[in-house]
Amino acid sequence: MAIIKDFAVVDLFCGIGGLTHGFITERFNVSVGVDFDNTCSYAYETNNNAKFLYKDVTELTANELNCLFPKNKRKILVGCAPCQPFSIFNYKNNNNVEKQAEDSKWKLLYSFADLIEATQPEIVSMENVPQLRNFNGGKVFNDFVERLETNGYFVSYGIFNAQDYGVPQRRKRLILLASKHSKFELIPPTHKDNYVTVQQAIGHLPEIKDGEHSEDDFLYFARKL
């Protein structure tokens, strides 16, 4: 399948490259993934055949980011900032609002907004846990959206459940798309009445007992009970 050549993607907070892999699967050219966890580099580059840049996003300058995009390409900037400050687990185990506010990780969303403002990519995408929507009274997310709109972006967002799109798992995520050109119509559910089950997804795998590894695939194993 032909690559979509007009656009180039840079993936901030890329980790091992799940979002990058999705863009590559949809035929986009991903120029580079950026993360400050260097242990992700091998998996990222091996699985995606894309360059990994070991860099703290808070220290990435606008000029450095612009140089990551090939010349004469339309820029897509994506980022999934760490979700721990906004997660249900953190809410349940940390009721101290002041302590939550001091967690520097949530401020990474502001660093992301700074880079968007400074480089003006044509398209922006962001994904995080649904709790981000109401974190700190909604201020963090609302600030992010307001800065995008102030910079001329049409912003669309919503909370989506992976099971509604053919994934055999209940996993809700807040997804945001922003464009300089027009408002995105977010994809409606495709599997509302015909969810894919775990049995359908992995039922073809051979049975193994607890504590065993598959002879054919060392990544397929069952923990000892």
PLM regions and their residue ranges:
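Conserved Class I SAM-dependent methyltransferase catalytic core
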Residues: 105-169, 174-178
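Short, solvent-exposed coil/turn elements at secondary-structure transition points
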Residues: 58, 161-163, 208
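Core alpha/beta nucleotide-donor-binding catalytic domains of modification enzymes
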Residues: 2-120, 130-133, 139-141
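S-adenosyl-L-methionine-dependent DNA methyltransferase catalytic core
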Residues: 2-10, 14-28, 147-150, 173-225
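Short catalytic/ligand-binding loop motif for oxyanion handling, primarily in non-cytosolic enzymes
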Residues: 84-88, 132-135, 166-169, 183-186
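Generic beta-strand hydrophobic packing signal
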Residues: 31-33, 124, 158, 205
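Glycine-rich, flexible loop/turn motifs
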Residues: 53, 82, 156, 161-163, ...
